[in-house]
Design a protein with these regions (language model features):
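Transmembrane helical elements of multi-pass membrane transporters/channels
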Residues: 18-37, 137, 148, 171, ...
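Helix-terminus/linker motif at the lipid-water interface of multi-pass membrane proteins
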Residues: 32-51, 118-125, 181-188, 249-280, ...
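N-terminal transmembrane alpha-helices
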Residues: 7-45, 58-73, 77, 100-107, ...
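Residue-level signal for transmembrane alpha-helical positions in Major Facilitator Superfamily
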Residues: 17, 32-33, 70, 109-113, ...
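Short runs within selected transmembrane alpha-helices of multi-pass transporters and secretion channels
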Residues: 137-156, 164-175, 193-208, 286-289, ...
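Small-residue-rich hydrophobic transmembrane alpha-helices
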Residues: 50-108, 145-164, 270-328, 332, ...
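Short alpha-helical transmembrane segments in multi-pass integral membrane proteins
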Residues: 1-23, 78-141, 185-239, 296-361, ...
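Small-residue hotspots at the loop-to-helix junctions and early N-terminal turns
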Residues: 47-58, 131, 135, 194, ...
């Protein structure tokens, strides 16, 4: 019989590995089937292909950010009410309802206003057909991606972190295989990459839905059962996760515009390659922060505050070690990572330089992500929101306004490290006050 994880009294190191490892592997596999598009599209379509994907993807990223908000916000509430089936089912139903409403609105906006949306995010007349070719199939499958993203958080909160990981493994494996077939064997171009992503997302969502067959979770979407108060609570707790994820889209748009203005499609392509490479390390720290949340929120709900503090300190120690290792790997092996995407010498050179500059953000990014996740898990959404908003919008924007004036294109690369450094400085006083 499978041993049940004891969140309250179990060995901390074992619990940490049991929850953070599947969450981290899941997100790294998400990176792999996202980066598979980048590799196959760059090799099969050209550098303009990856620039097109990088312009269109922020909209998909926006919907994923919303579903992550619903999933983590709802899953945290479910963990607080562990054992209370009535409340668990209500929270679960609200998670699904919110995803359905958002998908309908976003899909309608994409299909009705494609051209102005893509042009606003940095596309030009040359890239627009490619962007549309990628976006249309992906938009159709985004409903499944949203459900899978939210359900991943719920499944983890239901003491099944490995099942959440398996769903991502299925999606990643299918995406890589189908990318190769559709782009190189069937010559479907950028649309082939979109079809591969769409099919893999559908498969992952279907697998996750199996977890709830015969479980205590029951879906009830009747209007009488829906509560705006519950929706507000879910959004309040999950909002920092939305900001962190949506920040990827916002930062991508801002930097795309800055790079296009500074050096055209070449610079935007270099940023696209760097963005894919950096995503691996970002996923590592996102996985750690998301994985530890169920442990923190469960013990916080049981008022076991000493254990909550111990978990935070332990997680920061692990994060520090991984940050140092990650930076060393990027400095010495970063050029080999970007070379996977393209063989163009000048593009590899600029991407490798940009990768190192951009990745200095890792010195503070892991620290920030863990703190934000901790604040969510201990029901401090206001402070978490302030930190997220400052990092994702205020500090990045300030960096883009100031740094390029002194260092040109290098200043654009350094805008994210600047934002994460300033966020860490802002966070420390809040953190000291809370953990006393």
């Amino acid at each position: 019989m499978k041993k049940k994880l004891d969140l309250e009294n179990g060995n901390l190191s074992e619990l940490f590995i049991s929850f953070t490892m599947p969450a981290t592997v899941s997100l790294i596999m998400t990176f792999l089937y996202t980066v598979a598009d980048g590799i196959f599209i760059t090799r099969g379509v050209g550098s303009s292909g990856i620039a097109a994907v990088n312009i269109g993807y922020p909209i998909i990223n926006f919907t994923v950010a919303l579903s992550l908000m619903f999933g983590i916000g709802g899953a945290t509430l479910i963990t607080f009410k562990k054992g209370n089936i009535r409340y668990q089912n209500r929270y679960f139903s609200h998670i699904i309802f919110l995803n359905i409403v958002v998908y309908i609105v976003v899909a309608a906006a994409i299909f009705l206003f494609t051209n102005p949306l893509m042009m606003a995010m940095g596309a030009n007349e040359e890239l627009l057909p490619m962007v549309k070719g990628y976006m249309y199939p992906c938009t159709v499958s985004t409903s499944f991606l949203m459900i899978a993203t939210s359900l991943n958080a719920v499944v983890r909160s239901d003491n099944a972190p490995k099942r959440a990981m398996h769903s991502t493994l299925i999606g990643a494996g299918m995406n890589i295989i189908l990318d190769y077939l559709f782009i190189f064997k069937f010559n479907l171009g950028i649309e082939g990459g979109a079809y591969a992503t769409a099919i893999s997302q559908i498969a992952a969502a279907i697998y996750l839905c199996r977890h709830f067959a015969g479980s205590t979770f029951k879906l009830d979407l009747s209007w009488k059962r829906l509560s705006f108060k519950i929706m507000k609570r879910i959004i309040s707790i999950g909002f920092p996760s939305f900001i962190l994820e949506f920040a990827v889209a916002i930062i991508t748009v801002l930097l795309n515009i800055a790079f296009m203005k500074e050096a055209g499609i070449f610079a935007a392509s270099a940023y696209g390659i760097t963005g894919y490479s950096f995503m691996l390390f970002r996923m590592l720290f996102t996985g750690l922060s998301q994985g530890v949340q169920p442990i923190v929120s469960y013990n916080y709900g049981r008022k076991n505050f000493a254990r909550v503090k111990k978990i935070l300190i332990y997680t920061h120690k692990v994060t520090f070690v991984l940050s140092v290792i990650s930076l060393i790997l990027i400095i010495f092996f970063g050029k080999y990572m970007v070379n996977i995407f393209t063989s163009d010498f000048e593009l590899v050179k600029e991407s490798a330089k940009g990768f190192i500059l951009y990745s200095t953000a890792l010195s503070f990014l892991g620290f920030n992500f863990v703190n934000i996740a901790y604040l969510q898990a201990v029901d401090r959404p206001k402070i978490s929101n302030i930190i997220c908003m400052s990092r994702s919008f205020v500090f990045v924007f300030i960096g883009l306004l100031i740094l390029p004036k002194y260092w040109g294109i290098n200043g654009i690369w350094l805008s994210l490290p600047f934002a994460d450094f300033m966020t860490a400085v802002l966070t420390i006083p809040f953190l000291k006050k809370i953990i006393k």
